[in-house]
Amino acid sequence: GRGVFARRKLKSGMVLGEIQGQIFPVEPDDPSYCMELPSGRVLEPAAPLRFLNHSCDPNCELFYWFDEDGSLQEDRLWLQTIRSINAGDELLIDYCWPADAAIPCRCGTPDCRGWIVDPEELHLLPRQEAPGALPRQTTPDSPAAGG
């Protein structure tokens, strides 16, 4: 698959840029890369940021910009780092999909939820590991290890 990678070391809290692309009033026929905006419209990002991959332990996040008067710029979405990132590391976001759109996650992080889903909606999904998810790491004292 594709991804987006840092060309140089990035500091935590850096605004990397605006997610630009085509805005649709409704979800297009192929919504694979689309992001819902607060206005209810849908943004289909342009390359390269359309290739941001998911992780349950992301190093970047998406945010909405507010004008000086505090009003939300509803159709403007930005990307920023949430921790330091080394040159060559992949930029990763948490997709936070609603439970009704969740799919199995294979990010492989120690805190993988097993599903690509908004953490606040994880309780709506089956408690067992998602089919095909990488096994969670266990320690000798963890319940999964029998300790």
Show where each model-derived region lies:
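C-terminal SET catalytic tail plus cysteine-rich post-SET Zn-binding segment of SAM-dependent SET-domain
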Residues: 56, 61-147
